[in-house]
Structure formats: C-alpha cells, structure tokens
C-alpha cells in the first residue's frame, strides 16, 4: 500500500539550540527528530519533529478525533522540570503547539504511554527516581488527577507502551 511510517526519537546535535545548552546531564540538549519510510529499508532525510524551546525526550504520539496529541518529557534540569507535558497538531508531522503545563505531579516522570478508554485518558509513566510506575487520568486532556495509587505493576518495570492485541494473542502470551 501507500502506508508511510514515521520513526521519531530524541537526540542532541551539538551546537543546535545553544540557548538551552547546559553542562549538567552530560550536556544533553535533546530535540525530537524523525524520518519516514515505506519499507524499513530506505529512509527519508532526518527532519526536526518538535522544538519546544527546552530539552525534550520520550515523546509518544497518539491520534485523537482528527488531531495528534504528543505526550512528552520536559527534560529541563535547571530549574528542574522532569515532568510530562502535552502538545497537539493537526498533522502527524506537525507543527505542534507549545507544550502545556505539566500533567504529572511533584516528582520526576518520564517514558509516557497513553490510553483512551470510554472517553477517559490515562497516561502511564516511569517515576524513575522512586523506582515505580505512576499514572494520571483526564476526560479532556486539560484537567488531570493522580491515579498512581490504583496501579499494581510488576517489580522493576520501566518505560512501557500500551497497545491493543486480540484475545488469541493474549492467550499465546499467557501460555
């Protein structure tokens, strides 16, 4: 078919975005970049995917009612952010809006993955300093509340991704 896939990642390109460059965190000053491919053998040139004006990592993008929602980590060290924020776009490749206010609480969070079930969003993430998983929920992507206390996760779990599988696939995984 005509399916085109987008592969995106965070990296630092030395000398780019000097206004947010610091020596802490190994001098990392990440932005989100992407390539496209139809066959996973040939790839487009690398393009800038998201430049929020701060060090950004761990983006995950999901479709929502005709728009694209990016959950991302603000990796700013000084003053510390280390939280999850949201940006939106009409097209997958952007341009994305400025990142909103943090949706996570007074702890360091990264590696978000999002679900929308029965009209409610849940964003799961790694509370990596606390060595545990966390979650927040929202009906509108604006007002968020903590639901971390409801989680029961395997010990040692780190960044994860939620995706849909069939009952048959589940049975094969369990057995």
Show where each model-derived region lies.
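Carbohydrate-active catalytic/glycan-binding domains of CAZyme proteins
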Residues: 1-175
């Amino acid at each position: 078919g005509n399916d085109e896939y987008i592969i995106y990642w965070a990296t630092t390109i030395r000398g780019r975005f000097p206004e947010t460059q610091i020596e802490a965190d190994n001098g990392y000053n990440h932005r989100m970049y992407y390539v496209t491919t139809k066959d996973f053998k040939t790839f487009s040139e690398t393009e800038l995917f998201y430049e929020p004006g701060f060090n950004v990592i761990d983006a995950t993008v999901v479709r929502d009612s005709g728009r694209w929602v990016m959950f991302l980590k603000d990796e700013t060290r000084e003053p510390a952010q280390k939280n999850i924020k949201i940006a939106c776009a009409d097209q997958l490749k952007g341009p994305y809006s400025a990142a909103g206010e943090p949706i996570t609480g007074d702890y360091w969070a990264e590696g978000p993955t999002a679900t929308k079930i029965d009209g409610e969003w849940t964003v799961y993430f790694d509370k990596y300093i606390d060595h545990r998983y966390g979650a927040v929920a929202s009906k509108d992507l604006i007002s968020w509340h903590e639901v971390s206390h409801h989680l029961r996760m395997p010990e040692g779990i780190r960044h994860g991704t939620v995706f849909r599988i069939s009952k048959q696939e589940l049975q094969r995984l369990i057995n």
